[in-house]
C-alpha cells in the first residue's frame, strides 16, 4: 500500500499527465498538482469494478443494509480528503425541468428519501421562489429528510435550494430550508457575453456586484453553506470566471463552480478550463470546486470525469441523466465510472454513494416522471447485464468477468448465476442446454440435438425464447410447431410442470 501512495507534487503531476495521455488529452494540458492522497484502507474500499460488498445475498435493493461507515464531520468548504468527490443530485430541480417530468409534492418527498438511501452528499430539491406549492414541498423535505440523521454513521444530506441573485429568491430559499440540519443556497447568475448582453443586459462589473451582494445577503440571513455558480460558464471568458468566483469566495461562498449550461464543451477543453479556473481563482484552496454538465452533444459524463481529473471535487448530476433538453450527466454513470476506474486510473478519487441503491432509485424516478430509459442505457438499462450472443453467453457461463466489468449486484440487481442470459437466434448450444438444466431437465446429447434443431427453427419466428417455449420443446416433442408455440394456448401445453425430468 505504501508504494502506491503519492507523496509529492511532482509524482502527482506525472501521474495526472499519464492519465491525460491515456484519455486523449495533450501532455501539455495545464492540470494543476492535486496533491492527491489515499487515506483509506485499501481493503475497505472497492479496488476493482466488482465489489465484495455487492456479493451479499439480498432479494431486492430494499433488503440491502446501509454500509455502516462513520462519516467524517461535514465542513461546507472543506473535504475530508483531497480525493473525495461530493455528489450533488439535482434530479428534484434540474431533472424536474425535463419537459413533462413534473412531480407532485409527495413524489418529490419519496424521491428525496430514496436519494438519502443512496447517500448523496447534497440534494438540490427545487426553486423555492417559483411557486407556493414548490416552496411547501421543499420545506417539507427540509423538515423531514433534512433532519433524519443516521445515528450509526452520522449521515444526513445537505438540502439545497436554488436562487437567482435576487433578494426575494434568497429570502424564499432561507425560509424553506432553515429547518434542515444542513441547509445550502445555490446562487447563480449568467456570465457569458451572450447571456449578459441579451438576457441580463448588464456589464461585467454589474454582474460581479450582483454576485457579491447576493453571497453577503445569504450569509446575513443565516446560511453558512453558500454555493455560487456561473451559468453558461462553458461559453464564458475564463479570466472572467476566475474574477467573479474569486470575488464570491471573498464575500463568503464555500463552494463555487460553473456549468456547461448548453452542453457545448468537449472533454479536453472542459478539463483544461476547470484546471485553469482552479489554478487562477483567488481563494480556490479554501473552497470546494463544483461542475455541472449538460448532455447536448452526448459528452456530459465524459466532461464530468474530465473535470474531476482536473481537480473538481463536487459533481452535479441527475438520476438517469434527466434534465433540460438532452439532460444532465447521469449520477449512475459518473459514480460507477469512479468506482470502476477511480482507483486504477484517477489516483483514487472516490464517492460515498451506496451504489447498491442505484437501480431502485432509477426505477422510482422513471415511474414518477414517466421518463423511461432505453434498454441499452448504461448502468440502469434493461440490457446492461444481459447477453444473447452465443460466444458471450459461453464466456459468461464460465466466468462473468469475461464480458462484464461491473457486477449487477453492485447497482442493486439481484441475479441468479445465469440470469443475465437471454435466449434468441444468436444463442449457442451451451446457453440453451444450461438453461434447460436450470429448469430441471437432464437432457441426453442425442435428445438435445433434436431439441436444439427445433429451437433454431423457433428463433426464426421469435426474437426471444422464453422458459415456457423451452419447456414446450422438451415436453411435447417434435409435433409442437413454432406456430403453436407462439399461440395463446402455450399455457395449455404446460399443464403438467416438469420439475426434475430426465429426457
UniProtKB/Swiss-Prot annotation:
Transit peptide: 1-51
Keyword presence, Chaperone: no
Compartments it resides in: Plastid, Chloroplast
Temperature dependence: Optimum temperature is 32 degrees Celsius.
Domain Pyruvate carboxyltransferase: 85-359
InterPro entries the UniProt entry points to: 2-IPM_HCS-like, AIPM/Hcit_synth_CS, Aldolase_TIM, LeuA/HCS_post-cat, PYR_CT
Name of this protein: Methylthioalkylmalate synthase 3, chloroplastic
